[in-house]
Amino acid sequence: MSYSLLSAVGSGGLVGFMLGLLGGGGSMLATPLLLYAVGVAQPHVAIGTGALAVSVNAFANFASHAIKGHVWWRCALVFSGLGVVGALLGSSLGKAFDGERLIFLFGLLMVVVGALMLKPRKAVAAKPAVGTFGLATALNYASSGLVDWVLAAEFIGGGVVGGVFGMLLATRLGAYKNVLNRLFAALIFTVAAYILYRSWGAFLPA
């Protein structure tokens, strides 16, 4: 088994696990994992591939939570519907942006997401939103040939397995949700710092 396959499946497993355990924030790890762990050379391909994989994993994990009654449906439907427009506009703008600069801005966004993770959240409305936004973004990138379909399949395979374990653990650690969110926020801040360190040079004059 090749390193690229192991890294793709392992990275997908980590993202799926976080989605199953926490509900949404884990999707932020997909792009940096594809870039720095799997070794995808083009930032736009990493974003498009990660968006596709995360959307599939998010919908898969969401189904289990919906069956258990953990979904705040009104919020989920409104948030997902309105967010599609933003996802399409944002991904169209992102495709026109320099890849390295886009990754730097992504690092800044991760800081914001990390801060939001510190706040208590209600029932799971994140997963259908993550899935819908991700699918809209992925289709937009795919239309420009910016999705690695084989890599996405490997990532999704790992994500399905990781999501199962994440959901099983979530039922046992439900009382510690806020603690888990804070720990994950610390991870998000760490990854964001690494991304900003690696990509800040994109804004330096040539």
Named regions from a protein language model:
Residues M1-M18, T31-P43, A63-P128, A142-A206:
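Juxtamembrane transmembrane-helix boundary motif
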Residues M1-S2, G20-L29, I47-A58, A129-L139:
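Hydrophobic alpha-helical transmembrane segments
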